[in-house]
Structure formats: C-alpha cells, structure tokens
Amino acid sequence: MATYKPLEYLEHLKKIVPDLSDQINNIKDTYENKLWHQLTKQIEMIIISPQLLEKKELFNFYTNFIRDFENKLRPLSLVEICIAVARQFDTDESRKFIETISQKVKKDKSAYILTLSYIANMNLRSGVAEQLQDCKKTLELAKEELQGVTGLDTIVYSSFYRVSTDYHMAKSQASEFYKNALMYLSYCKLETISQEEQASLAYNLCIAALVGENVYGFGDLIANPILKALEGSQHNWLIAFLKAFNIGDIQQFEGLMSQHRDIISTQTAITNNMQKLRQKISILSLLELAFRTPSDKRSISFSKIAQATKLPLGEIEHLLMKSLSLNLIKGSIDQTVEIIHITWVTPRILDLNQINSMNNRIAEWTEKAKTSLRLVEDDTVDLVA
C-alpha cells in the first residue's frame, strides 16, 4: 500500500473520488489553516459519503491524512471517526484497530470508554466463546471507568449500555438485560433505532421483565415509548400482560392466559417459567394491596392477603417471607394471629390509576389533618376561656 504525505494524499484522493473534489479542497484549506474543530466537522461529513465508502478508502484516509494531526483533535471525535473507519474491516481487524486507538486516548474518559465499548462489541460479535469472556472483562473495565464520573457525552453511555444489553442477552441473563436495556433507551433517541430493532428490543424487554428474577417494577417499561413498536403486532398481548403484572391483577392475568393460550404455548420463555410467573404476580398483588392500604392501617391479615393473591391460606407466610427476603417490603409477621405489620413498601413508578389512588389518599389525609387542627383550635379556645 502506497503512503503519502497529507497534502499529497488529498490530491490522490480527488482522483479516486472526483465527485468529492470540492469537499476535499475545503478540507485541504482547513488543514493548512490548522482549524482543527472545523476540520473535524468536515472529516465527519466526508467519511459517511457513499463515494468514499464504496471505494473502501477510509483506512487510507486515516493512515495518510488524519493520523498526521490526530493528537490535535478532540479525543472523543477522533474515536468516533476511527470507529467509522473500523467498520470497513472484518470483526477481528476492526477490534485490533480500535485497540491501537484506545491506547492513544486512554487519558480521556469519554474517548477511552467508547473504545472499550466498541472492543467489547467486536468480541461479542465474534461468536467465539473465549472472546465472549473477553467481552465481559472489557465491559467490567469500562464500568470501572464510569464509576463516580458524570457529565460524559451521551454516546459514551448509550454505547456502553447497548453492548451490555447485547452481552446479557447472549448470556440469557434476564434481570441484567432488562436493567441495561432500559438504561440504553434512556440515553439514545428512539428514532435512531430501526423499527425492526425496536420491535425486537420491546419484545425481549417484556419477556425479561416477566421472567427476570429480580424484576418487580414494570413502570419504567410501561411508560417507555419502545412498547409502541408492539402495538398491532402478534406480540401486542405482552403489553396487557405487563399492565396486569404491574398492578398484581391475578384475575386479569388468568384471563389473558386463557385468551392468548395458543400464542403463549409457543413462547418457551413463558411456558418454562409458569411457576415463577405465578409467584411473581402473587408478590405484586401483595405489593399492590400494601400500597393501596394507608400506612397507619398496614397490619394486614393473612386471610385478606389470601383473598387478594388467590392463594391458599397455608401459602401466605411463605409469600410474605419471600417478599421480605427480596426487600420488597419491610415489617414483621405475627404468626399467632396471622397478621403482617408492614412498615415500608418498595418505591415504584405509578400508572394513572395508582396516581389517582394516591391522590385520593392524600385528600383523605388532608381532611383528617384539618379535622385534627380544628379540634386543637377548639380545645385552645376552651383553655383560654
């Protein structure tokens, strides 16, 4: 491969892609004037041009031109440019190229973490078991770099959480997949994700929410516009499932199971976890009961819980012990009289019905406070008299 000095290469490049001559001339002028920020923007534009991509000239563009002044560029911008270059290689070459860039930008948090995320992604895409382990190690390193750091560029967070999402998907780790996928969605614009990918991600999120060991909050997902990708599709039933679980509505859950039994029978993630699903919705039913019960009346009988959860009375203590061990509620069980005294319920994102319920309870509390105030005022008047 021939090598050129920067300006010589630009002249050579104009012969390869004559349609881009004007852009290349502008780049030449900006380079000669050492306007590095403006040059960065021009490079970002030209490297996505179909003509340059078709000629597979990006690596030569980097080697013969960009590398001459790469230390003048903002490190994160350099990494983004190099990632565009790396996409023209196969997975292994792409990873090795970004590994060399990673060492050059190691002192810059944003740039370094972005390279780590890309390297982890290439390890994941290789499909080789050993490199899957390398993916994990690289993600752990990136996570360490993120600890205690705020205010990094959005692309740094979105790239990290996207690769983490894909990794946990590959490892069938539902709870971690759910957590990382929601973080990814919080840092990326939905319109940048294709409709097909949105539908796939929404489906996998719903399944992960339902079967994930430690997932007992569905409000984040229900409120996320990603679920619109399932509306009108064959997986639309999952939205109704989530909403039933979110409020612990066992009757609605049973109805949906019956209504959609044919398609549910094809969902092995659901059918293989039916016992866990029934336990989860029972716990969520308990949480809903506790949430709707005023805090000064949260001494709840086993029989009332059995009625709400549709469980036999003999299974209630086990349900309560499970909920306490998961730190979803705090309190104490009085086995003698079969009552639990709940002192705390895990916070969660509320739907409109739950918000209305809380509003009603606040209104009731306000009236009680007003009544108490009036009684105090009346007693004060009597004392003064």
Curated annotation (Swiss-Prot):
SUPFAM superfamilies: Winged helix' DNA-binding domain
Residues in PCI domain copies: 176-347
Pfam families membership: PCI, PSD13_N
Swiss-Prot/TrEMBL GO biological process terms: ubiquitin-dependent protein catabolic process
Keyword entries, A-Z: Proteasome
Transferase found in the keyword field: no
GO molecular function: structural molecule activity
GO cellular component, one term: proteasome regulatory particle, lid subcomplex
Entry annotated with the keyword Cytoplasm: no
Family in the record: Belongs to the proteasome subunit S11 family.
Function comment: Acts as a regulatory subunit of the 26S proteasome which is involved in the ATP-dependent degradation of ubiquitinated proteins.
Protein name according to UniProt: 26S proteasome non-ATPase regulatory subunit 13
Organism name: Dictyostelium discoideum
